[in-house]
Curated annotation (Swiss-Prot):
One of its GO terms (molecular function) is magnesium ion binding. It comes from Streptococcus pyogenes serotype M6 (strain ATCC BAA-946 / MGAS10394). This is Putative phosphatase M6_Spy0533. The keyword Magnesium applies. Keywords: Hydrolase, Magnesium, Metal-binding. Its EC number is 3.1.3.-. One of its GO terms (cellular component) is cytosol. Belongs to the HAD-like hydrolase superfamily. Cof family. Phosphate binds at I10, T43, G44, K196, N222. The keyword Transmembrane helix does not apply.
Length: 269
């Protein structure tokens, strides 16, 4: 059965190390679209952090979709209509916020509107995230967060501090939440039902596609869930070694237009 849905991660996959979309990748995406293939961005970023990429790839028109917040939100890329939205509760927020204080690491919560932190001394990686995803930062005390629609929370800090903190997180948190380390300085907390994999399942069903018609392309541990559910998992040459063990195909690196290579070799052929 031919591949009709291709989910593509952004950082380390779609983009080069200097954060560009190569001409070759752009052309391959257009070729796939012309053959009726749904090319879908699947990212941990919020929608504000991918709008410019959707525009560059011409994936912001009728019939296009985007997976954001690692699967916490699936939207129509043209209208913004929400197909899937899974939120953390206020109790989830409090529990995770107070854990971060106990562990001595910075924390922020993300909604569709912005990045919220209770850290009076705002962490540099919160500022980094704000710049990366083009979202404002708001300082709010925990008491002021009661009515916020939180899609994910992030512990953010220096890699050595974060690694030490991770070792002290009680097992209860791993049982209750989906927890992924998306970069050496980001640890993301989401509802247990949230993953890029579940988002792809929802989207494939909406589009009337069988999972045998799906492909995912990624490079990092937060791509594992989507690589495990699709029939055609593709890992970048620059991907994590453990991830390559579950790949059906290994494509070229992100700096060598690996997404274009994968689309042309295994989707359009």
């Amino acid at each position: 059965m031919s591949i009709k849905l291709v989910a593509v991660d952004i950082d380390g996959t779609l983009l080069t190390d200097d954060r560009r979309i190569t001409d070759d990748v752009f052309q391959a995406v257009q070729e796939a679209k012309a053959q009726g293939v749904h090319v879908v961005i699947a990212t941990g970023r919020p929608i504000a952090g991918v709008i410019s990429l959707l525009e560059q790839l011409e994936l912001n028109h009728k019939g296009n979709h985007v997976i954001t917040f690692n699967g916490g939100l699936v939207q129509d890329a043209e209208t913004g209509e929400e197909i899937v939205k899974e939120l953390m509760t206020y109790d989830d927020y409090l529990e995770t916020e107070f854990l971060s204080r106990k562990l001595g690491v910075h924390m922020h919560a993300i909604t569709k509107e912005g990045i919220y932190t209770a850290n009076r001394n705002i962490g540099k990686y919160t500022v980094h995230e704000s710049t990366l995803v083009n979202m404002p930062i708001f300082y709010r005390t925990p008491e002021e967060m009661t009515n916020k629609e939180i899609i994910k929370m992030m512990m953010i800090d220096e890699p050595d501090l974060l690694d030490a903190a991770i070792k002290q997180i009680p097992q209860h948190f791993f049982d209750k939440y989906t927890i992924v380390k998306s970069t050496p300085f980001y640890l993301e907390f989401m509802p247990k039902t949230v993953s890029k994999g579940n988002a792809i399942k929802h989207l494939a069903k909406k589009l009337g596609l069988d999972m045998s018609q799906t492909m995912a392309i990624g490079d990092a541990e937060n791509d594992r869930a989507m690589l495990e559910v699709v029939a055609n998992p593709v890992v970048m040459e620059n991907g994590v070694p453990e991830l390559k063990k579950i790949a059906k195909y290994i494509t070229k690196s992100n700096n060598d237009s690996g997404v274009a290579h994968a689309i042309r070799k295994w989707v359009l052929n």
